[in-house]
Amino acid sequence: MRGCLQTVRWLTSAWQRPRSYSPLSRAAPCRFFNVSIPRNAQSRKPVSELERRIAAISIDRFRNFCIVAHVDHGKSTLSDRLLELTGTIQPGGNKQVLDKLDVERERGITVKAQTCTMLYNYRGEDYLLHLVDTPGHVDFRAEVSRSYASCGGALLLVDASQGVQAQTVANFYLAFAEGLKLVPVINKVDLPSADPDRALEQMANTFELDPKSAVLVSAKTGLNVEQLLPTVVEQIPAPVGDHTKPLRMLLVDSWYSTYKGVILLVRIFDGEVRAGDHVGSLATGLKYHVGEVGIMYPGQTAQSVLRAGQVGYIYFNPAMKRSQEAKVGDTYTKVGSEKLIEPLPGFEEPKSMVFVAAYPVDASDFPHLEDSINQLLLNDRSITLQKESSEALGAGFRLGFLGTLHCSVFEDRLRQEHGASIIITPPTVPFKVIWKDGKEEIITNPALFPEEDALRAKVVELQEPFVLATLTFPEEYLGRVIELCESNRGEQKSLEFFTATQVILKYELPLAQLVDDFFGKLKGSTKGYASLDYEESGWRRSSIAKLQLLVNKVPVDAVSRVVHSSQAQKLGRLWVSKFKEHVDRQMFEVVIQAAVGRNIVARETIKPFRKDVLQKLHAADVTRRRKLLEKQKEGRKKLKAVGNVVIEHKAFQAFLAK
């Protein structure tokens, strides 16, 4: 009994004592994080040996450079050798490390600008080298020019067997305009067909570069490549920048990650950027919290800071989800510093100059095609997209590209990476309509081109885009090339010999002629020795009209095209003869016509199946014979008037095939 009373007394006193809460009690919840840390800041990690070495390098020992070359002159292979020499990647077995896309490896071209950071010890001091591997083709000129803006110098690479080509010339002038220090490099000197002396002579005559300063290498075998890195350190100037000034960051390129959103490739001109910083775009006005910063070494390697002079990557948290927000050439700065800095020069929106329509072969595949196109658009903000519908081919898309190679690469990626079965219409270019009320309209879809009555009553002028084309080729093909350019409505601007046997020819050409397999015809005229580059040359007044394909007087909407008046009849004849091959015979006569407005320029007729109505008739019954034939003729007229021509989907696919 006494024990029970003591227990009750102890419990009562315990209840009356002040409570002391444990750290895990509900009134005082445990917090496993410090609330004073910004929500986007990275957890502090031990500083790596790589980051320690980079932090010890001052900006005067930074070198940002790129490789300027024609397509297939060995840019990506030379990049591999430089990465191996600096220990960034292991030697042996590397092939085009900076070419990430399947289509880049398959075609041997660079489509997306890539970068890699290298550490190089020269005379006992560490140097931080940033190599930017740029596209060589004119279609990707926006990426090329922004890549050049992030560099202080360039290796001007020329194939020893092919010599200076059109894109070498075009990219040289882009690099020269950016003020880059150019180092001449002759590649592929190990080939039996190599002629380095001729290549050096061309570089001296065309670019006024000293042949004695050139480095002769073989990127494939590694011959003399080790001489390039000391040349880069000695000849290419260090970037200019101040890490104490407000942040000025140039967007060089971007790509999309499923987990991180849009990742930006950037060059820091002033200031520095860290994870947790609040930055904004001067072009769009949008603001973001930085989630991570780092360098490409050669993959994404996180760093605590990117400072003035460096080239690296950043992504945001929350993520940037729309690639259209990442505009190449845009300037970023910290929020609050927008009025303290000037935007970096050269920003311009990419303009689509080649348009195609894409339709699924099977109409039920439209959702898959839409999803595939949207996924590819995440990595390419320069493509324009618009849904459209055709009575002949069903639902599809009208896509705008920078050029024909850009279009071809996108089509290859759509088929290879997403397994899309598609019908692509021939490429078209935009046209400008100037109305009588002063309004100007850009037409990118032939279906929206004004009809004949509207052209006469309401339109003042029609214009089409022209380009200045630069062609390089051996002198023996000069006559053929001039003939080709003249037949494509070209106007000669200049002709010069930059060696005894090589010619640079400049022509102004309509862009519509250029996208109509002009390069293929040029290669055929010169046995593959010619190269081509071009730049926009503005709009010109032109006599253009809409050519339509009619089947039994009904327009086929998917096949209409805007052409020059001088070519309407020739193209119309080609259309009707080709379309006739793919249309099945019907029970009635099928008339295929090509028309410009009300004017028929070409015609083909598909004869109907013939039923022998005289089979059971007595040979001598002439009156009955005539009566049956007249009746059959009348029946066919009625059938033709009310019957619809059945055109198989595969007929359009075959007709539109290249």
From Swiss-Prot:
Q: Where is the transit peptide?
A: 1-40
UniProt KW keywords: GTP-binding, Hydrolase, Membrane, Mitochondrion, Mitochondrion inner membrane, Nucleotide-binding, Protein biosynthesis, Transit peptide
Give the superkingdom in one word.
Eukaryota
Q: Write down the membrane topology.
A: Peripheral membrane protein
Q: Where is the tr-type G domain?
A: 60-240
Localisation: Mitochondrion inner membrane
Binding annotation for GTP: 69-76, 133-137, 187-190
Q: GO CC terms for this protein?
A: mitochondrial inner membrane; mitochondrial matrix
Question: Any keyword Mitochondrion?
Answer: yes
Predominant subcellular localization, coarse grouping: mitochondrion
> One MF term in GO for this entry?
GTP binding
- Pfam families assigned: EFG_C, GTP_EFTU, LepA_C
Q: Which reaction does it catalyse?
A: GTP + H2O = GDP + phosphate + H(+)
Metal-binding recorded as keyword: no
Q: What is its EC number?
A: 3.6.5.-
Give the record's GO biological process terms: positive regulation of translation; translation
Describe its function. Answer: Promotes mitochondrial protein synthesis. May act as a fidelity factor of the translation reaction, by catalyzing a one-codon backward translocation of tRNAs on improperly translocated ribosomes. Binds to mitochondrial ribosomes in a GTP-dependent manner.
Entry's family note: Belongs to the TRAFAC class translation factor GTPase superfamily. Classic translation factor GTPase family. LepA subfamily.
From the Swiss-Prot or TrEMBL record, give the protein name.
Answer: Translation factor GUF1, mitochondrial
Its gene name is GUF1
